[in-house]
């Protein structure tokens, strides 16, 4: 008796949904990159310039972290899709062996 139940079609559907979520997130981050990394100082004083530079640095760091997170997300989606295919192939092989 198996204690693990895997439904390949559900894994594949989850991979598709996660792929869509990842693409939307990447697009949103790309759209936010220019306005957040190019913060214009509100005034011509030194404090405003330093504050704007500080915000721009944080935005650049966010973009870097987001790119790494997107890469990890893509690897996870690929692994999930591959697992769905593997489970489906195993089910077919087990059904053929049982016949």
UniProtKB/Swiss-Prot annotation:
What is the designated name of this protein? PE family protein PE13
Tell me which species this is from: Mycobacterium tuberculosis (strain ATCC 25618 / H37Rv)
Query: Which part of the chain is the PE domain?
Result: 1-93
Function of the protein: May play a pivotal role in the interaction between M.tuberculosis and host. Can enhance the survival within macrophages under stress conditions such as H(2)O(2), SDS and low pH. Increases the production of IL-6 and IL-1beta from macrophages, and decreases the secretion of suppressor of cytokine signaling 3 (SOCS-3). These changes probably involve the p38-ERK-NF-kappa-B signaling pathway. Also precipitates the macrophage death.
What triggers expression?
Expression is positively regulated by Rv0485. Induced by different stress conditions such as surface stress, oxidative stress and acidic pH stress.
**Carries keyword Transferase?**
no
Q: So which domain of life are we looking at? A: Bacteria
UniProt record similarity statement = Belongs to the mycobacterial PE family.
